């Protein structure tokens, strides 16, 4: 309960209740829950078997879960052994969006620094806890969605199949990316048909990789095979776009300190902030198998050994920017909460009532009431969710109230 960065968890009737409006899908609760009570929902493999042609889009993090001497093409071959017809990486989209980001920032005049929209958990955090910073979030879509859009628009003609016969599946490193596909907030629906976590596929993928590696040589790699580590690690985005005045930060506690600084008009000398919820970036995702530090080392070595530089025509980037191809469909807006009201007078009354109740409390954040802090309890009272006597200290005093 106390680990949740947005205080979205309450204990009611001996059960953990998660507030959907406050949850940012960071997955912290999944990793710290001692009984494993919180479980993410992914798609069973059998549910996607009806597609005539199945395309898998792996997160670049997947490659880092294996030793650096495992060629990325071996991972592709292993995925095909699992029944996928084609594997498409996000490297091309990452490179294109990196170039598009630079062009967007040059044209975008005004408040700084701008903030990346790459991490869905960070986007939700800003919408919930830092609504004044929403205007600073770069409204460019993410590499996985742009990749899936390319597949959806080009593969039907290429394969001679109907769009609905082609299944596009993502392999995700974290809960936030799963939710962003199953319940996208900034678009009507995701371009993906399904999503697996890295944990879902790792145990069945590893034996295939071990078997394929025996006797495999780099001569077996097709000449047209391309590998790009993309934005898997912290700093990957800023490395791709080759910026000067940037800041890369990871981990929710660290990110919130930076967002506090931005909200207080600090960091004005910074043009861009790459903010990621998981420590060290996506390689620290809750659904990964390997230690993030080992995975980071693997990713760096793989990048040095196998990565190809991707060339994209400048005219293509300009055309896609002007046509809105790279942008998120819907505007990024603050997420409304039931604590505040659209009516200013009502909101002020609620804030005053919250302060009045908070002053009555012991302010020791014991958590016995089922709220993570005394301030959270006061907010719950204002919302009409608890009674004052739910606080054990006020109950001992015989305090009356709602």
PLM features per residue range, with description:
Residues 39-367, 372-402:
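Iron-sulfur-associated redox domains of electron-transfer enzymes in respiratory
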Residues 1-34, 126-131, 136-140, 402:
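Helix-enriched interaction subdomains in cytosolic or periplasmic regions
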